[in-house]
Amino acid sequence: MCRTPRGGKTPHRVRGEATVSSREGRTMRRWLVALALAGTATVALGGCVQPHRADGDLIDDWPPLSAPRLFVPATDACLPRITPVVQAGTYETVECARSHLAEAVHVGMFTGATAGGTRPEPGSPALRTARAECDQRAREAIGGDWHAARLTLNIALPSVTGWLSGARWYRCDLSETDSIDNTRPVNRVGSLRGALVSDNPLVHRCFDPKLIGNNLNYMAPVLCTEPHRAEFVGVYVERDMSWAVFTRSSQQVHRRCMGLIAAFADVPNNSDLPYRAGSIFYPPSQREWEEGDRGVRCFLWSDDRRLTRSMRGVGPKGLPAI
């Protein structure tokens, strides 16, 4: 049974500026005032003492001004708040051992045409290259696909002022979420690095879906040894298409998920498969989709019997066609 309404829900997603503080500039102004006063004194004493001739170059002995340094946020840092735009004046990090909302797993740089134009807007297709890089860096940091866990990935950008001043960075922020249905980031303690290398409660496993009529209300996580009707089987990457086309492609998504279910349970992907299980799927939000996220989460769905074990590798006898 294809539970396409699971994909119809759009959960809430929460997703810098250059400052130049020049002490040299203030010192320079003092020196200019001092030189002006010295010149006045020289003129006043001109009738009495032969003035010392200047060398003609008023600035040859001044230290050169250092180039303005653009603000770039730190990577491998944890953040007490999440904002799609980072202001240098309000930028703040905390130790990952303390409570925080996100972890910056990478800071990259825009290049090419994107870097030469106006600043990309959050949720725009101009962020596709950045999101692809963020996705790969997140995988490297946590040891697996973040879609397979209670995690969400957001991109932070410089302010428009920072962009106009030359900032071309983007930051990849990874956060723990409350559940697969509520993807609002929640506070956590500890770094996410290596989180998916070993067994971790963040990873999606078994669920007992709660329905209202034929529509999914939410997915309650349970132990796989407890009675349940759904289990996470994996993620597939959807082909490139518009959001409008994707929302009309539930049957195609269902077929792709059924292929993952067959591989997960080690059963044939044939005409008997719909009599063994159905699918539930969670796509990216529209904003994530527009930025280039194509990861669709797939779940095995057992609508006619409760399961009390994982269906991973059970074969045709463990997941019979009925």
Predicted regions and their residues:
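N-terminal export and membrane-targeting signals
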Residues: 21-38
